[in-house]
Amino acid sequence: MSKVYSWRKLNEKELTRVYLDEMRRDFPPTELKPLSMILNSEADGTAHTWGVFDGETLAAYLLMVRPAGSRVSQLDYFAVLPEYRSAGLGAQLLADLPQHERGAQAILIEAECPDKAEDETMAVRRLGFYARCGAPV
């Protein structure tokens, strides 16, 4: 039986910590929006961030963008923390995401184009991961 992780939306303090401690490690500076922009989007309701927890410990985060009235949620940032990687958690979370994004008819995954990415190898790996999870790329 696979481990059960709990999902909940992060508050401003938690999101700030995730940005400073995790996102700056997980994404190159050219891909990372300023924290103030992310917090403003959360405050005005156009974005929210899921924290996925193993007990009380953060295992992954997914930052979603969905403007009011939109039926499409966009996966803007997604990362599994290093100690939880390579165990299938990322694929499990992508499969579970639609049940958490209530009201969305589709989920759009944003990913860097390899020829324009700062880190081409990472961009290719990301696209490969999404393709293995069943996303059309």
Feature annotation, model-predicted:
Residues 40-51, 60:
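A short helix-loop-beta-strand connector motif used in the catalytic cores of GNAT acetyltransferases and
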Residues 101-122:
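Conserved GNAT acetyl-CoA-binding A-motif
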